[in-house]
Amino acid sequence: MIDGDIGQFETAQKVSELAIKRFGSIDAVVANAGIFVVKPFTDYTADDFRALVSTNLAGFIYITQLAVKQMQAQKTGGSIVSITAALVDNPIVGEPASLSMITKGGLQAGLISLASEYAKEHIRFNAVAPGIVDTPLHSDLGEEVVKRQSPMGTVSTVEDIASAVIYLTEARQVTGEVLHVDGGAHVGKW
């Protein structure tokens, strides 16, 4: 376990070095660190902006740069899977999260570009875009409110997200994809 702020290059460097020391290679990265701030756009502060960019973007960039360099040296390809958000593609009225979505949406756009840039080296970039997941983060919303967030009327589990990550990590011919795990919320209004 590494203690540190993933938005700092030094932390990413420690993670990378430990992975290589412990496993001998880096074959897959799951960039799961992220924060989500819900408030009206005009209420975001400079501190909110810095925190969102540091964790959601810099946290992805630093660890991914180091992992890609290692994968290139290994010449065996690899997989980078990031966690974004279904709200990027289908915002929900009453859940103002524009600054969070700017960082997550930027991450999705960057993944597609990286998938193209590193395809010839068989380094794949994909994302899982969860909707509402049954975690303590959503425990105060109430079961009925949460179930209305998807047309299936269900809530994703941590296992649902993990299964999607495993699929994208192992699917050798899949790159540049955003896999929505949101009970159909990304398909639009229902």
Map each language-model feature to its residues:
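Active-site loop of short-chain dehydrogenase/reductase
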Residues: 25-27, 71-86, 120-123, 177
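Substrate-binding pocket helix/loop in short-chain dehydrogenase/reductase
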Residues: 40-41, 48-53, 146
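C-terminal substrate-recognition "lid" of short-chain dehydrogenase/reductases
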Residues: 123, 158-181, 186
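A short, exposed helix-loop element centered on a Lys and neighboring polar residues
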Residues: 64-65, 112
